[in-house]
Regions:
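Nucleotide-sugar donor phosphate/pyrophosphate-binding loop at the beta->alpha transition
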Residues: 116, 127-148
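Carbohydrate-associated surface elements
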Residues: 162, 184
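A conserved mid-protein helix/loop that constitutes part of the nucleotide-sugar donor-binding site
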Residues: 20, 209, 213, 218-232, ...
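N-terminal subdomain of nucleotide-sugar transferases
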Residues: 1-49, 408-413
Length: 413
């Protein structure tokens, strides 16, 4: 089978869960069945890679369009890159797109090459209204591109049952076209790896427990709510915020002000690492952390929780989207329910209460080392049993085979 993967994120340009998903899924697809399949990846960037079962080519915009609103530049770049992708994606049996950035290209390839189109739902634009801060009115264009792609897709991979429900509710996709295939984790890479040198490098004390956040500074990831929870945490705990890549200058300022307030209002040591760290250092932080916190207000799946659990770290997370399909409340962590404003306006109705509830859950685990240890062991076991990339790649390949078979039958009819 010749598989086309279209994506905006691919190593080394990975900054979110979608990029992690594409990296590992692609690798596993290329390795399945003794290399009988060939995977062609077209990604935003300048990547270049070739092996008998995998070819990766980066695509960059050939020119820049002078946009009246600078926030529109990303959309224009995306459309040019998608046009280039659609011309390069040839000799395929199926095309698989990840995030709205590649949807225009996927729709073109479906029509030009007469092959089935698959989309993976890493997120849905209607659930991310704050993106208008980053894209301006181009947010409405990205939403239109996404809606058009879902209307044209032969198959949709939902990374959680919650996402399947959202796809059906928002875009009215036939449930028979949607298959739930969870995200996964590299069990060899993500496992407990102590490294006291990493703690020393960032000024994290080894004689006191710390609570960890890892992620981008975005509305979606809810980091502001965690920062606002710090003053309610037990004395003596450190807070490590491994948080960089702010979506906009405005949220960068908001984050800085929130951290300054937290430092002024509490006696806690707050370590803010303002960059996205390489995997080995993040794994060391997971390993040494007492608790990992995921305060997302919108999370279709949440690979980040799998990473922490694989490193035997208990999780406190918001009970939104696909997170409850990963974190078992009371077994591998604790879930906190933020009451959303509405089905599409996912920010908490009462932000202060959400912050207090996060702190209360963290305090429960801080006060009970035996419970933390039990959850840590169960977390690793759950990940091993249910979230291996090999299994996920095989499920995805099976979906491809079903879609190609149905497409072939329609052509013969």
């Amino acid at each position: 089978m010749r598989i086309g993967i279209l994506t905006n994120e691919y190593p080394p340009n990975v900054y979110g869960g979608a990029g992690v998903h594409v990296e590992y899924l692609t690798r596993e697809l290329a390795a399945l069945d003794g290399g009988r399949n060939f995977v062609r990846v077209l990604a935003f960037g300048d990547q270049s890679e070739r092996s008998p079962t995998l070819a990766v080519n980066g695509v960059q915009p050939p020119a820049r369009i002078a946009a009246q609103d600078p926030r529109h530049s990303k959309l224009f770049d995306t459309l040019m890159q998608d046009l280039m992708m659609s011309g390069m994606a040839t000799d395929l049996d199926i095309v698989h797109c990840h995030t709205w950035y590649s949807h225009f290209a996927g729709c073109l390839v479906k029509q030009l090459q007469n092959v089935p189109l698959v989309l993976t739902t890493h997120s849905l634009e209607p659930h991310r209204p704050w993106k208008v801060e980053q894209l301006g009115t181009a947010y409405h264009a990205s939403s239109w591109l996404e809606r058009t792609a879902y209307q044209n897709a032969d198959g949709v991979v939902a990374v959680s049952a919650a996402m399947k429900n959202d796809v059906q509710a928002i875009y009215h996709v036939d449930p028979d076209r949607v298959r739930v295939i969870h995200n996964g984790i590299d069990l060899q890479q993500y496992r407990p790896r102590p490294d006291p040198g990493v703690l020393a490098q960032y000024g994290i004390r080894s004689d006191a427990p710390f609570v960890l956040f890892v992620g981008r500074i975005t509305r979606q990831k809810g980091i502001i709510h965690l920062v606002n929870a710090i003053r309610h945490l037990r004395p003596g705990v450190q807070i490590v915020l491994c948080a960089g890549a702010p979506d906009t200058p405005e949220i960068a300022v908001e984050m800085t002000q929130a951290v300054e307030r937290a430092r002024a209002q509490s006696q806690h040591d707050i370590v803010w690492i303002q960059e996205m760290l390489p995997k080995d250092r993040v794994i060391a932080l997971y390993t040494h952390a007492a608790i990992f916190v995921c305060p997302s207000v919108y999370e279709p799946f949440g690979i980040i929780n799998l990473e922490a659990m694989a490193c035997e770290t208990p999780v406190v997370a918001s009970s939104v989207g696909g997170i409850p399909e990963v974190v078992e409340h009371g077994e591998t962590g604790l879930l906190v329910v933020p009451e959303a404003i509405s089905a599409t306006e996912v920010e908490p109705r009462n932000p202060e209460q959400f912050s207090r509830d996060l702190a209360a859950a963290v305090n429960v685990l801080l006060d009970d080392p035996e419970l933390r240890q039990s959850m840590a062991e169960k977390a690793r076991l759950r990940v091993e049993r249910q979230f291996s990339w090999t299994s996920i790649a095989r499920q995805t390949l099976g979906f491809y085979e079903d879609l190609i078979g149905a497409h072939s039958a329609r052509r013969k009819a």
